[in-house]
């Protein structure tokens, strides 16, 4: 088992790597969802996001192809893929503050194609998650998570 200082060092290392390609975080709508348009086709968007996650040393947990699941149920759905990933030394701190925060961790990043054929990414704003779960003692960690997701999504929002 790692000591708390080792966890902190791991979290700081991930943030340092992430901030090297940092761009300002996007703002969420009233529903707490941040939506960002990708400049790449869906397959390349997913590949770029996964590569950026790996390059930052963040743990990639799963890729759920929702349109494939829908097809298996006889339902037509435009391309829609859910990526889950995270940095346990950072993310689990939120759950220690409120176990219900486990509903929002690991991080979920949706990549989908709109009716117009545009590719979008969407994720839940971390400030909104903090308010949802009444977590007030992890401000620095929520800021860090916001900076990390902004860095990851910047891999697909500009060429």
What do these predicted regions represent?
Residues 26-57:
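Terminal, regulation- and interaction-focused segments at domain boundaries
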Residues 18-23:
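N-terminal signal peptide c-region/cleavage motif recognized by signal peptidases
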Residues 1-11:
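Bacterial N-terminal signal peptides that target proteins for export
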Residues 126-159:
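C-terminal partner/receptor-binding element of secreted or periplasmic proteins
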Residues 108-135:
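Beta-strand/loop substructures that line and gate deep hydrophobic ligand-binding cavities in soluble
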Residues 43-46, 50, 67, 146-153:
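Extracytoplasmic/secreted envelope proteins and their assembly/folding machinery
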Residues 38-46, 63, 135-142, 146:
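Solvent-exposed, acidic/flexible segments
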Residues 50, 54-107, 111:
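Compact, glycine-rich, soluble single-domain proteins
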């Amino acid at each position: 088992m790692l000591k708390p200082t080792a966890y902190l060092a791991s979290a700081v290392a991930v943030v340092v790597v992430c901030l090297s390609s940092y761009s300002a975080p996007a703002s969420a709508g009233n529903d707490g969802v941040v939506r960002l348009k990708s400049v790449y086709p869906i397959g390349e968007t997913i590949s770029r996001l996964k590569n950026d996650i790996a390059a930052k040393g963040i743990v990639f947990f799963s890729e759920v192809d929702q349109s494939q699941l829908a097809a298996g149920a006889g339902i037509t759905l435009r391309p829609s893929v859910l990526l889950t990933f995270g940095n346990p030394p950072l993310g689990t701190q939120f759950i220690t503050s409120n176990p219900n925060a486990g509903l929002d961790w690991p991080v979920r990043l949706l990549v989908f194609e709109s009716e117009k054929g545009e590719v979008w990414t969407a994720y839940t704003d971390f400030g909104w998650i903090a308010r949802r779960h009444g977590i007030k003692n992890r401000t620095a960690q929520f800021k860090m998570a916001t900076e990390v997701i902004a860095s990851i999504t910047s891999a697909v929002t500009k060429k």
